[in-house]
Amino acid sequence: MTSPSTIKQKFIAKGHQLGVVAVGFSDGQPNQGVDPSGLIEAGLLDQLRDDLEYDIRHDGQVHTYAEFVPEHDPNHRGMKKPRTVSAATQQLSRQVYEHAREGRLVLTLGGDHSIAIGTISGTAKAIRERLGREMAVIWVDAHADINRPEDSDSGNIHGMPLAFLTGLAKDDNEDMFGWLQPDNLISPRKLVYIGLRDVDRAEKRLLREHGIKAFSMHDIDKYGIGRVVEMALAHIGQDTPIHLSFDVDALDPQWAPSTGTPVRGGLTLREGDFIAESIHETGSLVAMDLVEVNPTLETLGASETIRAGCSLVRSALGDTLL
């Protein structure tokens, strides 16, 4: 029987209030069907409410942001659907900001990883206003997602969010991420990756040039997941709010096959849960994203992927083995 967490949360003003935003947005990449409905139908929100005793604040909708999609959205700087992704993430940023400003822990269920432009920008702004400090981002993913538009081979914006969020990519057009202001951004020094194993050449160069802390699967194989998480948290520092952005493709396809860009040689589900548990234990978590669950891909593995996603969220929000 699961019981609520006893870990004191340092940066959450409203105790067990959990702001939830469900986002069925797929336009940052080519595969439709990236949607959190399977997670919700599997009982994830009920588990968080009944077992972990969260006071859930959710509007009951899965937001697609279809009403914000422009009639014409030609490529810009190589980006595909830039106005669509910009409009959706700007709206999501406002939603996350409202929850975080009220002092709630925020959970966003995606959606492809382009939505992090919205979630992280909203959390960063709220934390600056409410606490007067910068937050850190722990990005758990097979991919670095820090391509600048001109460096991207695909043009898919789900491979670019961290370039915009760190200010390494900018655009002056309001309808193409020009709405991002300094208080929406994070410092590259406050970004840590875990689980990388498919990183583009230009991204490797950016990581080196800007001294961004990154732990690949090589590091996990060498040191073990426990030591890697220790080093990641030490880099961030003890008194720093944490936004955890978890792409389910960080897990090996054995555990999460129903995702758009699976890469073999990834985390086990237990390693993924350990990362989430360890971040919860710090008491510093202020927001979490779970993204790239797509039950329409590898349909035979859809239930396995959904179970894995639910486990990662529960672990980050205080579920324990004992």
From Swiss-Prot:
UniProt KW keywords: Arginine metabolism, Hydrolase, Manganese, Metal-binding
Residues where Mn(2+) 1 binds: H113, D141, D145, D247
One Gene Ontology molecular-function label: manganese ion binding
Cofactor: Mn(2+)
Catalysed reaction, written as an equation: L-arginine + H2O = urea + L-ornithine
Cofactor info, note text: Binds 2 manganese ions per subunit.
Record-linked InterPro entries: Arginase, Ureohydrolase, Ureohydrolase_dom_sf, Ureohydrolase_Mn_BS
GO CC annotations on file: cytosol; nucleus
EC number: 3.5.3.1
UniProt cross-references to Pfam families, sorted A to Z: Arginase
Pathway stated in the Swiss-Prot or TrEMBL entry: Nitrogen metabolism; urea cycle; L-ornithine and urea from L-arginine: step 1/1
Binding site for substrate: H143, A144, D145, I146, N147, S154, G155, N156, D200, T261, E292
Self-association state and partner proteins as the record states: Homotrimer.
The protein's name: Arginase
Gene: ARG
